[in-house]
């Protein structure tokens, strides 16, 4: 049961990250409704550097966010399937998904919207229950 819960929770991360990456490059779902806002983003740079624009940074942040979530899934799915004893025997590997999903849940609540919030909440519940089963 612990293994299945980890796989379910991490698979949700992979699905959310993949959808996010597809939406970033193949749709306009992350574009602002106000076209003038997008144009302004394309014309101005962040104070950090003139080497990019707010728009290019926005696309890059969305892409790197997606890739990070997908990488988490790409590491933990095979680990849970092929070497679950590593997760079971390590406090670090059994609790890291709890910390990661709780962090994303907080971000989703504060900055994002309902779909990622629900996805990360379900993942967190899976990870918490799995960790509890492993350590009791």
Spans of model-derived segments:
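Perimembrane helix-loop junctions in membrane proteins
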Residues: 23-31, 79, 83-86, 111
């Amino acid at each position: 049961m612990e293994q299945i819960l980890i796989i379910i929770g991490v698979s949700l991360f992979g699905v959310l990250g993949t959808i996010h990456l597809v939406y970033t490059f193949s749709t306009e779902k992350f574009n602002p409704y106000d076209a003038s806002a997008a144009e302004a983003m394309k014309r101005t740079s962040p104070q950090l550097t003139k080497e990019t624009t707010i728009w290019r940074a926005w696309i890059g942040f969305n892409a790197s966010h997606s890739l990070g979530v997908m990488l988490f899934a790409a590491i933990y799915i095979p680990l849970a399937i092929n070497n679950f004893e590593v997760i079971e025997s390590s406090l670090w590997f059994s609790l890291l998904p709890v910390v990661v999903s709780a962090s994303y849940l907080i971000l989703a609540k504060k900055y994002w919207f309902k779909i990622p919030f629900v996805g990360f909440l379900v993942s967190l519940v899976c990870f918490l229950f799995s960790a509890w089963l492993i350590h009791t």
